[in-house]
Amino acid sequence: PKPKKKQRWTPLEISLEVLVLVLVXI
């Protein structure tokens, strides 16, 4: 995992997280 300095969530990161969850879920 990459070390995160800032806890700021970008829309792209959220989209990637959701996409991964959906793919795993399938």
UniProtKB/Swiss-Prot annotation:
The keyword Transferase is annotated on this UniProt entry: no
EC identifiers of the protein: 3.4.24.11
Organism of provenance: Sus scrofa (Pig)
Residue stretches in coiled coil: none
Similarity field: Belongs to the peptidase M13 family.
Membrane topology label: Single-pass type II membrane protein
Localization terms from the record: Cell membrane
Cofactor(s) in the UniProt record: Zn(2+)
Name under which the protein is recorded: Neprilysin
Source species, domain of life: Eukaryota
UniProt keywords, alphabetically: Cell membrane, Hydrolase, Membrane, Metalloprotease, Protease, Transmembrane, Zinc
Keyword Zinc: yes
Co-factor: note: Binds 1 zinc ion per subunit.
Reaction catalyzed: Preferential cleavage of polypeptides between hydrophobic residues, particularly with Phe or Tyr at P1'; substance P + H2O = substance P(1-9) + L-Leu-L-Met-NH2; substance P + H2O = substance P(1-7) + L-Phe-Gly-L-Leu-L-Met-NH2; neurotensin + H2O = neurotensin(1-11) + L-isoleucyl-L-leucine
Described function: Thermolysin-like specificity, but is almost confined on acting on polypeptides of up to 30 amino acids. Biologically important in the destruction of opioid peptides such as Met- and Leu-enkephalins by cleavage of a Gly-Phe bond. Catalyzes cleavage of bradykinin, substance P and neurotensin peptides. Able to cleave angiotensin-1, angiotensin-2 and angiotensin 1-9. Involved in the degradation of atrial natriuretic factor (ANF) and brain natriuretic factor (BNP(1-32)). Displays UV-inducible elastase activity toward skin preelastic and elastic fibers.
A molecular-function term among this protein's GO annotations: metalloendopeptidase activity
GO CC, any one term: plasma membrane
Top EC class, one word: hydrolase
GO biological process, one term: proteolysis
